[in-house]
């Protein structure tokens, strides 16, 4: 779905910008990347259409250190790489995950954090 972040086997990161009604849960899916200048498209096995995306540079890949119960609008995230980030956008979600992987990347809206295991759009965060 829109906003989902994919890491390819070549360790490049892409954020899907198209809306996709189809929901496919495939781990290690085959992904082909096509680009024309700065425009990128992904073909993902199991999804019926080519998806527009942004290539992401400087992605921070880590995991939340310990239990993760969700976020409430002002949540602070302590990562295993010793960085601390704070939620900077409204939103509440409840979950129960242990050391979920996170990707943090810069966008025109600021930094976004994608928390794996949470089926929600990436949230806006700021470094503390």
Label each residue range with its predicted role.
Residues 20-34, 90-105:
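Short nucleic-acid-contacting surface segments enriched for D/E, G, S/T with interspersed K/R
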Residues 13-20, 84-92:
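Short alpha-helix capping/helix-loop boundary micro-motifs
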Residues 118-128:
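Short, low-complexity, Pro/Ser/Thr/Gly-rich segments in the mature regions of secreted, periplasmic
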Residues 1-19:
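N-terminal targeting signals for Sec/Tat export/insertion, comprising classic cleavable signal peptides
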Residues 2-6, 40-41, 72-77, 111:
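Short aromatic-glycine-enriched beta-strand elements
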Residues 1, 54-71:
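Structural detector for short beta-strands of small beta-barrel domains
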Residues 38-51, 109-117:
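Short, Lys/Arg- and Gly-enriched loop/turn segments at beta-strand edges
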Residues 2, 10, 26-28, 73, ...:
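Short, flexible surface segments
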């Amino acid at each position: 779905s829109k906003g989902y972040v994919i890491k390819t086997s070549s360790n490049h990161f892409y954020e899907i910008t198209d809306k996709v009604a189809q929901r496919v849960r495939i781990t290690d899916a085959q992904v082909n990347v096509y680009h024309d200048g700065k425009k990128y498209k992904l073909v993902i096995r199991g999804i019926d259409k080519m998806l527009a995306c942004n290539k992401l540079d400087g992605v921070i890949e880590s995991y939340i250190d310990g239990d993760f119960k969700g976020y409430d609008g002002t949540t602070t995230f302590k990562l295993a790489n010793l960085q601390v980030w704070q939620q900077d956008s409204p939103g509440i979600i409840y979950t129960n995950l242990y050391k979920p992987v996170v990707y943090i990347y810069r966008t025109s809206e600021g930094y976004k954090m994608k928390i794996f295991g949470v089926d929600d759009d990436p949230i806006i965060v700021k470094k503390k």
